[in-house]
């Protein structure tokens, strides 16, 4: 395993840190087919033979590009993107050639030679981990990090220069405590509990910390000229909205838009919001959303537990 950037300044405590896999950042579908069909050595040889060929952007590329652009807007480095890859440094050279080609300010990386990179997330001070490898994402979530599996699909690049991120509520920003009541007792039991606990803040979910860090970054821009916009897109509706609003108020976290859809299909609303990425715990919601926006599946909570 080799870590790049180790001689650079070590303090990244004041930055929002995104760790991203090479397959989430770039389109490595052709080389991945070689790996699946012919094994590691054939993959290595393929990458070396093609290392001067620039990779096409992957599903999370626009998100990374917009995040890094915030540094120039602020005049200082407040966002750090780190490449964490199952490649070796040898096979990863093509990825760094592509990073250089696109002018992405990514200098730190961990190439772990076929193993999961998640053990290095803490050392890098990671706020969010994005990967196409579901097992790595689950391991990161279990270790307490915000993490999502980036799904490939028909999503087109969001046209706006504004960075737009959409979040589901239960099991993403919040814990899955309410979702468990809904799945065990149905809608009536869920709504009764939410009315009863309207003034009792929900526990935080895996993305609470990332949302808080993003919110702090937003506050560094003028209110009328902030290039970051966030949205809560939830299947909740009244009367279950009050507890959500009061919880966010208790946490001192602001969301720019809140959509309480009462069970309506989310994909049309995510497309209207023009999200650069949407995070949701429910696989069914993600399958629909991936056709219109870049989508991160958060395999957390009761909806992702194996049936008993």
What are these regions (language model features)?
Residues 3-16, 134-165, 169-196, 208, ...:
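Asp-based, Mg2+/Mn2+-dependent phosphohydrolase catalytic module
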Residues 3-115, 159, 168-260:
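Alpha-helical substrate-recognition element adjacent to the catalytic core
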Residues 22, 85, 130-131, 234, ...:
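Short beta-strand/turn micro-motifs composed of small residues
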Residues 71, 103, 125, 144-146, ...:
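Glycine-centered loop/turn motif at secondary-structure junctions
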Residues 89-90, 115-116, 135, 238-239, ...:
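Short alpha-helical
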Residues 99-123, 127-134, 148, 252, ...:
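Active-site phosphate-binding/coordination module
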Residues 100, 122, 141, 249, ...:
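Anion (oxyanion) recognition and catalysis
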